Amino acid sequence: MLEGYYIVENTGVVPAERRFKFKDLKAWGYDLHLGTIDGREAYFVSKAGTREEGETYTEGGKEYHISETQKEIPKNARLLARIVIEKGQPYLEFWLDTEDGNFPLAKEDPRLILHRFWTEKKFNQLEKHVGSVGLTTDFFKDRVFVKSIPLPYEEYPPKVRRVLREVRDVHRDLTGFGRFVFQYFGEEDKTHQYRLWWLLPTIHLFDVEVSNEVDKILAMLD
């Protein structure tokens, strides 16, 4: 992609952490419980549908007892998460920030959670075109079937320009950071020919609404 490309770029700061909603936690595949860990009151998670209220179990050398499975984020609490890189591998850490302190919930491979989450939500574009996942995640999509020269922006049709506007809206309103590189080669047999590369902050992709918007944009020219 060395020539004839159009860039939509917002050079904001990649966020270290952000707040999420209960529906996001459910989309990741977790249930949130109030109970005890080794006899001390705590919040913790389990894989969705695998544990029941009143159940006591041992995991990782600790004893868990579930008093109540939550149906929403507790009052005056926040669900927070961040991406960290350790020994060259990314992890999603998330925890519950409450008036009584922080309760670590899990530290998981973000690639596995995104795969589970995107598959369940049928975000097929994200699943198909994702490249690498770290503090940022990149997507690459190549729909060029006949070799030709990329067109200048002035020759982009309205539908293609709309895609670029939608990308700007995502960067401005949802992620605050992003780089979208686009080449357009015109139409062949009523099919848009294009190539794109999109870099976004990984942490924002764990938001159901953000992933939904990105998935829709990636499908707009198909």
Swiss-Prot record:
Domain of life: Archaea
Pfam families referenced in this protein's UniProt entry, alphabetically: UPF0128
HAMAP family attached to this UniProt entry: UPF0128
Family from the record: Belongs to the UPF0128 family.
Protein name (Swiss-Prot/TrEMBL): UPF0128 protein TK2294
Originating organism: Thermococcus kodakarensis (strain ATCC BAA-918 / JCM 12380 / KOD1) (Pyrococcus kodakaraensis (strain KOD1))
Lineage: Archaea, Methanobacteriati, Methanobacteriota, Thermococci, Thermococcales
